[in-house]
Amino acid sequence: MNNSYGEIIKISTFGESHGLIIGALIDGFFSNLYISEKFIQKNLNLRKPFTSLFSTQRREQDKVKIFTGIFKNKTTGAPVLMLIKNNDKQSSDYNNISLNFRPGHADYTYFLKYKFRDYRGGGRSSARETACRVASGCVFKNLIYNKGVIVRSYIKKIGFLKINFKYWNYTLNRFFSNLLFINEIKDIINNCKNSCNSLSSEIVIIINGLEPSLGDPLYKKINSTISNYLLSINATKSICFGFNFKNKNSFQVKDEIKNSGFTSNNNGGILAGITNGQPLVIKILFKPTSSTSRKIKTINEKLKNITNKTYGRHDPCVGLRAVPVIESMLYTILINKILKKKIYE
């Protein structure tokens, strides 16, 4: 099982949904960088469960503790170890699936591959693991911002509801770009929960201030690296860079160049896998949460046809808590790409 990502600075995550702890180890970190648990906690609070009626009701405080690699709030260059306790586990909710596979989950494929699985909340495959990505990735946020790079994301679509972008809002809920849609969002999520269902979502990410020439041709393209990382997030099904090319011809999407710069940005800031200095535009689609409390047809480990009902506490829409995870992983990608570019300079 591969539990690490990164090129120069590498991050390893560990722990399971219903284990004692989850955590992350950052290796290859440079020294003398200020890091505070308070700053990490602020970012973790953006994704933690039980922050609204529209997320899982699992009550985890996600309190992070740094154990190594820090002295007087500065990195020493040694590996940085972070741990988060799991406090609100209800493993008994999953007793009925100890031998049954939940459709849409990792149960079936994990069992095929490893011949054994932790069925409690999905074990290692649970989105609980993404707290580790936020805790470790957000430490690069200020480094990225100090270089003039701004990473911002918003929810573009929930189920069939398209949310028209109006402005960046950082006061009430920074992930919704148009407060006029809040009541509609509440209605469709409430209706979804009441019918024991879940919804898909689409997230748009715009990165401004990226320097040109980040990324390498062919097998280390910046868009292939981003895809590799972001598609590892639970429930992601597709990723797109730039704007919709479907049913378009060349003249409609070609970004012409003048000595003053590009006249458009249909390619989303990337050409041939290398940044061109324009805003980087990414769209990610999340499938509906697989766990719902309806009875559904499946099989058990003996390949017997059965019907099964999933209990436990689950998000009605994954995208509502996905934005901090996406942004934290992008910080990790970008700092690695920036450091790698310096090697060639």
Curated annotation (Swiss-Prot):
UniProt xrefs under SUPFAM superfamilies: Chorismate synthase, AroC
What Enzyme Commission number(s) appear in the record? 4.2.3.5
- Known partners and oligomeric status: Homotetramer.
Q: Which family does it belong to?
A: Belongs to the chorismate synthase family.
Task: List the cofactors.
Answer: FMNH2
What reaction(s) does this enzyme catalyze? 5-O-(1-carboxyvinyl)-3-phosphoshikimate = chorismate + phosphate
GO terms of molecular function: chorismate synthase activity; FMN binding
Report the protein name in the record.
Answer: Chorismate synthase
GO annotation, cellular component aspect: cytosol
Pathway field of the UniProt record reads: Metabolic intermediate biosynthesis; chorismate biosynthesis; chorismate from D-erythrose 4-phosphate and phosphoenolpyruvate: step 7/7
Keyword tags: Amino-acid biosynthesis, Aromatic amino acid biosynthesis, Lyase
Q: What processes does the entry annotate via GO biological process terms?
A: amino acid biosynthetic process; aromatic amino acid family biosynthetic process; chorismate biosynthetic process
This protein's species is: Carsonella ruddii (strain PV)
